[in-house]
A protein has these predicted regions:
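A late-sequence structural motif
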Residues: 252-285
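Alpha-helical linker/hinge and terminal dimerization helices associated
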Residues: 43-44, 64-88
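A short LG(V/I)-centered, amphipathic sequence patch enriched
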Residues: 41-59
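Secondary-structure junction motif
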Residues: 180-204
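Central regulatory/effector-binding core of bacterial HTH transcription factors
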Residues: 90-148
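Hydrophobic hinge/microswitch elements
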Residues: 205-250, 254-257
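Short beta-strand->loop
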Residues: 152-162, 244-258, 265
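Short helix-boundary/capping micro-motifs
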Residues: 11-27
Length: 285
């Protein structure tokens, strides 16, 4: 059996990025944290932490951290099932998802499920698949169904995609010509503009104008409000700007544009994630 205090010290160092910050969280001295981590490394016979700023895990350390996260989640669920009083168990989990799924689905679901101590990793769907296969995240959202051993998959309600632009841009570009205007995206091959364009103009829609790359989907929305281009984004993200009039919907009343998403998580953690699965309205795929 591994020492719980040493495991807690090791995890705290990587969560906070330093031995000093870990000591403050744990309420012990920095020397005590260092000794516990060193003892754990000696017990296992390998280095777990790169002594950099911030501190980073070695390959073995990354695997150990995943083990700690999984074990903590299952321990918390066991104590809940047994109806016992938990001694302040703090389960930490990682979820990977594309930016549109984070903004359009995940954040609200996390709030409804009252999940705590989570980390969201923003990646495209293909990268989410890789992270799931390597076990570097506990769960993930992709835009296509997957079949991975040991991973449970669920289909999510389709997400409505809406296109908007500033009032000035809408005046300058008739609806039929909007595709020629600059579009704001997080990556050159972002699928959201194409999904929206196909729903509104058909599969053989005109070629897009220039793409302006932004750091996040939220920045795309802000950029659209500033007149930098038009944006296709989850409907929920655009409700506020549409209500204030800083953005105008393009092609309202036409066919609904939707994007499908799928929720995947490690099967052994399904019970621990039940509140989030419910909040996402997920159905077994």
């Amino acid at each position: 059996m591994l020492d719980y205090a040493a495991l807690a010290a090791f995890a705290a160092v990587l969560r906070t990025g330093s031995f000093d910050a870990a000591a403050q969280i744990l309420g012990v001295t920095q020397s005590a944290v260092s000794q516990r981590v060193k003892a754990l490394e000696e017990r296992l016979g390998c280095n777990l932490v790169q002594r950099t700023r911030p501190a980073r895990p070695t390959e073995a350390g990354q695997r150990m951290l995943r083990h700690i996260d999984d074990a903590t989640l299952m321990e918390a669920q066991l104590i809940k099932d047994l109806g016992l009083l938990a001694p302040n168990i703090s389960a930490h989990f990682r979820i990977a998802a594309p930016s549109e799924a984070i903004n359009g689905l995940l954040l609200k679901a996390l709030g409804r499920a009252q999940m705590q101590n989570f980390e969201i990793v923003q990646r495209n769907s293909d990268d989410v698949l890789d992270l799931l296969q390597r076990g570097e995240v506990n769960a993930g959202i992709t835009s296509r169904p997957l079949s991975i051993s040991g991973v449970a998959s669920y289909s999510l309600p389709p997400m409505e995609i809406v296109a908007c632009a500033s009032p000035a841009m809408v005046r300058n570009y008739p609806e039929a010509a909007i595709l020629k205007a600059p579009r704001l995206v997080t990556a050159p091959k972002s699928s959201l503009p194409d999904i929206w364009a196909k729903a509104h103009f058909g599969n053989k829609h005109d070629a897009f104008g220039p793409a302006r790359i932004m750091p996040s989907l939220g920045d795309c929305v802000i950029g659209a409000q500033s007149g930098l281009g038009w944006v296709a984004a989850p409907n929920d993200m655009l409700k506020g700007p549409l209500e204030t009039g800083s953005l105008v919907q393009i092609g309202s009343g036409r066919a609904r544009a939707e994007k499908a998403f799928y929720w995947h998580l490690q099967q052994r953690l399904e019970e621990a994630f039940t509140p989030l699965i419910t909040a996402l309205n997920a159905e077994p795929a």
